[in-house]
Amino acid sequence: MDQKRLFLAIAISLGILLGFQGLYRHFVPEPPAAARTATNAGQGKPNNTLGAVPTDATASQSPPPKEGARLAVDAPRVKGSISLVGARFDDLVLRDYHETVDKNSPLVRLLAPLSGDEPYYVEYGWVPEESGIATPGRDTEWKADAATLTPNKPVTLSWDNGAGLTFMLKVAVDADYMFSVTQSVRNTTGKPVVLHPYARVRRDYRPEVEGYTVLHEGLIGVVDGILHEITYKSADSDGAKNNGLAFEHASTGGWAGITDKYWLTALIPDQITSVDFSFRDTKPNGRDGYQVGIISHNPDQVAAGAESASTTHLFAGAKVVSLLDHYQAEYHIPSFWEAVDFGWFWFITRPFFYALDWLYHLVGNFGVAILIFTVLVKAAFYPLASKSYRSMSKMRLLAPKIQSLRERYKDDPTRMQQEVMQLYKAEGANPASGCLPMLLQFPIFFSLYKVIFVTIEMRHAPFFGWIHDLSAVDPTNLFNLFGLLPFDPTHISPFLHLGIWPLIMGGTMYLQQKMNPPMPDPVQARMFQFMPIIFTFMLARFPVGLVIYWSWNNLLSIGQQWLIQRRTKLPRPELAKV
């Protein structure tokens, strides 16, 4: 009975750790858009201004704006251009990242123009409170006071509406991924003008996503101090019920944007300014499209002869953890670190990342950092492991007595269980202690999996030999004889992938299992014999960095168990016969 409970505990623990996030999102869905709208309206916010960022619903049926002059963007980590037709940020490439591990592969493109197949861009504008005021739109031709935007040279775009209003966008970029855009209006009309400045991120297509419950890709933001994550699918369903609106909320400060696994495009208003956030399903030209917008809650009152200005920051780049932390501190952005999906166990996952990142900067290789990290974890749990292995050794010595009790009381299971428990108590043995180290390994395993899977630092991080990307699966495959046969078995089935490192992991798990005392129940013993095979195939599709961790952890466990048993007075068990 104890062994059955133990086996059940292991299964439940693994299920909870690997499935918690998916179950939570399934059973605790986000409130429907209508309910959120009612809640926001109750905060004293006029309903006619909530979510008032334009969507160009009518313009979406017209052809893309004409191509025109462009303002070049040349910074250390990004390059591209800004269209002067519409002042659209629609051409941005990340200098530090390639699409594949091949250094000759194209650089990662983050933003793309309307004329392409996958438009992804950022726009700025104004909404007047009075009709009849001409404001810049998607076809507006702006003038730039320079040809190239660099970190040392901001550029101002301007447009005169011909009726006494001059609209200006002063654009600056730093050495990393942060733009600042100051929207200003000069009023020479002779009367006051009331305007709401806005900004929006638009993705006029639905991208392919990883599809994992442990990773969010889609619309994201920290609004009123709360993280909001809406998938593309949820945006479609919520938007269909509420005229395209999936989420809206008024907040002082915050941030919002669209996130991919490694990349983020986010709007960051002044953190002391009251703004309205909205997430929308836009359906441009009848296909899926998405918009994240922010608009000033309180309008700019531009007096006659005066000028107004408001500044918004735009993050467009890779979700480098240290950079997010830096920007969070510099601009007082609330919880900007949550752009990286560290998950519900972030209180474990984040410290693990920082430890691995520190070790990486110490040794220069994330694979080696994982090995050192594993040694440190093993050392921290050594006292517990020592106690566990001593109890396991006692269990091995008690095996003949337990077998004798089973034979004596085979017709009375209740009495047999009582006698076995009395024997455990008398000898000071704990049948569950042998699996305690494995149970403790699961949260470490899950947290390390999150770190390797979601952080940009692990992307294309090499190890040794054939491992060029710790975040990807082992590229070798037993089923094509490790590349000797010219075909890809995964085209037949995704399960036909078994690399060298998963095989090493399975072998070390088998050796570790043989050092444990045999289970008294032959049925459960046979079940556990298949565990190395099951885990080998399971981990074959996991990031190879995680498989390396598990393999190294198994080897350390074998050595640790051998050392502990050698130091005790109990006889050191031999490997069980196969």
Swiss-Prot record:
The chain crosses the membrane at residues 7-27, 362-382, 436-456, 491-511, 530-550. Residues 37-50 have a biased composition (Polar residues). Keywords: Cell inner membrane, Cell membrane, Chaperone, Membrane, Protein transport, Transmembrane, Transmembrane helix, Transport. Pfam families: 60KD_IMP, YidC_periplas. One of its GO terms (cellular component) is plasma membrane. GO terms for molecular function: membrane insertase activity. It is a multi-pass membrane protein. Residues 35-70 are annotated as: Disordered. InterPro entries: Membr_insert_YidC (IPR019998), Membr_insert_YidC_N (IPR028053), YidC/ALB3/OXA1/COX18 (IPR001708), YidC/Oxa/ALB_C (IPR028055), YidC_ALB_C (IPR047196), YidC_periplasmic_sf (IPR038221). One of its GO terms (biological process) is protein transport. NCBIfam families: PRK01318.1-4, yidC_nterm, yidC_oxa1_cterm. Interacts with the Sec translocase complex via SecD. Specifically interacts with transmembrane segments of nascent integral membrane proteins during membrane integration. Belongs to the OXA1/ALB3/YidC family. Type 1 subfamily. Required for the insertion and/or proper folding and/or complex formation of integral membrane proteins into the membrane. Involved in integration of membrane proteins that insert both dependently and independently of the Sec translocase complex, as well as at least some lipoproteins. Aids folding of multispanning membrane proteins. This is Membrane protein insertase YidC. It comes from Granulibacter bethesdensis (strain ATCC BAA-1260 / CGDNIH1).
